[in-house]
UniProtKB/Swiss-Prot annotation:
Identification of the protein by name: Short neurotoxin OH-5
Organism: Ophiophagus hannah
Residues the UniProt record annotates as site (Key residue for inhibition of muscle alpha-1-beta-1-delta-epsilon (CHRNA1-CHRNB1-CHRND-CHRNE) nAChR): 44
Function: This three-finger toxin binds and inhibits the nicotinic acetylcholine receptor (nAChR).
Keywords carried by this UniProt record: Acetylcholine receptor inhibiting toxin, Disulfide bond, Ion channel impairing toxin, Neurotoxin, Postsynaptic neurotoxin, Secreted, Signal, Toxin
Site for Key residue for inhibition of muscle alpha-1-beta-1-delta-epsilon (CHRNA1-CHRNB1-CHRND-CHRNE) and important for inhibition of neuronal alpha-3-beta-2/CHRNA3-CHRNB2 nAChR, residues: 46
Family the UniProt entry places it in: Belongs to the three-finger toxin family. Short-chain subfamily.
Gene3D superfamilies the UniProt entry points to: CD59
């Protein structure tokens, strides 16, 4: 009985998410953010003339540039 209880306790601890982490979209797939990263962002930038580049992911603070979006819920930056 003790073994069963101990096994159940170990499985519970392993499967339990001990801290909430934000999930954000990246250009290809999803990204689980680090605990300190509290925001998702989506930003369009022009590295070269007439060639927009989309950047997406987790961030510590919201970008302030033009054509950027910042949010703080799971998968909100699609």
């Amino acid at each position: 009985m003790k073994n069963l209880l101990l096994t159940f306790l170990v499985v519970t601890i392993v499967c339990l998410d001990l801290g909430y982490t934000l999930i954000c979209h990246r250009v290809h797939g999803l990204q689980t953010c680090e605990p300190d990263q509290k925001f998702c962002f989506r930003k369009t930038t022009m590295f070269f003339p007439n060639h927009p580049v989309l950047l997406m992911g987790c961030t510590y603070s919201c970008p302030t540039e033009k054509y950027s979006v910042c949010c703080s819920t799971d998968k909100c930056n699609k």
